[in-house]
């Protein structure tokens, strides 16, 4: 997320407590380029039920498609928002912001385990080492949700992800594109999972051929984690094609491409490797 006091994070099933409470309790919700997918509006009938919903989208077919809205505006986001700004009075809403800060204090804080490597620890360590000016890229899956939750960046277009498009394998190509466009002096980090990485690992050859210093962090749980999560939550644990089975040795794979590879199982090992 962009470092800004008004940014309170993602909404929906992969979002955080604070942002979901804010959406549930707000009186006006302005959605810009948001389609209200099933990951965001799990129950369209109760989503933001107390709010007047204003939806802005350049694609008219998206307006009111998944959630009933009170005002639908077709248009380019930049044009519409610039047209709206003169109509809005500057208000501070101190009570509302105080309530949001109280929710943030109650928000979920992951427990650290020295014997295991936790996703938030990995992302936190990478961000501490690479800084807010790095470009962070994700593939698709649970690692993508962790990254969206915990990366803090200040660089414009510093977080590159395909959002809800589900484009597994997107990450490596996007990281290569960012590195080529910004030059070798720009730090580029790609977060991926074992499932997504398998989709496009051949691009490691491209990265090596062009001597691109991309850092690739693979969250390896040997399974399509997000698919299995949905099968657990919504399909009575009727698992299909999501049993842990992958035994890929990513260290040897990296070395086969001429890259350096490290296998880490706890934070100390990760810090040493990084």
Regions found by a protein language model. Give the residues of each.
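Active-site diphosphate/adenylate-binding microenvironment
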Residues: 3, 101-183
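Glycine-rich, acidic loop regions that bind phosphate or pyrophosphate groups
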Residues: 5-99
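Short, basic/glycine-rich phosphate-binding loops at helix/coil junctions
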Residues: 96-105, 252-254
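Short beta-strand segments
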Residues: 31-33, 57, 139, 191-192, ...
């Amino acid at each position: 997320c962009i470092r800004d006091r008004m940014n309170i994070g993602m909404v929906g099933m992969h979002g955080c407590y604070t942002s979901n409470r804010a959406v549930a309790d707000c009186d006006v919700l302005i959605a810009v380029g948001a389609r209200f997918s099933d990951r965001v509006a799990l129950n369209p009938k109760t989503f933001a039920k107390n709010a007047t919903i204003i939806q802005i989208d350049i694609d008219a077919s998206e307006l009111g498609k998944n959630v009933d809205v009170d005002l639908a505006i077709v248009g380019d986001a930049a044009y519409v928002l610039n047209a709206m700004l003169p109509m809005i009075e500057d208000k501070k809403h101190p009570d509302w912001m105080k309530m949001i800060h109280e929710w943030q204090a109650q928000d979920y804080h992951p427990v650290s385990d020295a014997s295991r490597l936790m996703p938030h620890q990995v992302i936190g360590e990478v961000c501490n080492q690479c800084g807010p000016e790095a470009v962070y890229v994700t593939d698709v899956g649970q690692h993508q949700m962790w990254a969206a939750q915990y990366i803090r960046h200040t660089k414009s277009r510093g977080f590159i992800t395909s959002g809800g498009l589900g484009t597994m394998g997107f990450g490596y190509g996007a990281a290569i594109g960012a590195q080529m466009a910004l030059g070798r002096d720009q730090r580029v980090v790609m977060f991926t999972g074992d499932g997504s990485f398998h989709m496009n690992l051949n691009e490691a050859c491209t990265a090596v051929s062009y001597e691109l210093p991309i850092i690739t962090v693979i969250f390896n749980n040997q399974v399509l984690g997000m698919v299995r999560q949905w099968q657990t939550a919504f399909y009575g644990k009727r698992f299909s094609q999501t049993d842990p089975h992958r035994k890929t040795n990513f260290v040897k794979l990296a070395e086969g491409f001429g890259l350096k590879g490290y296998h880490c199982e706890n934070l100390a090992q990760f810090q040493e490797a990084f």
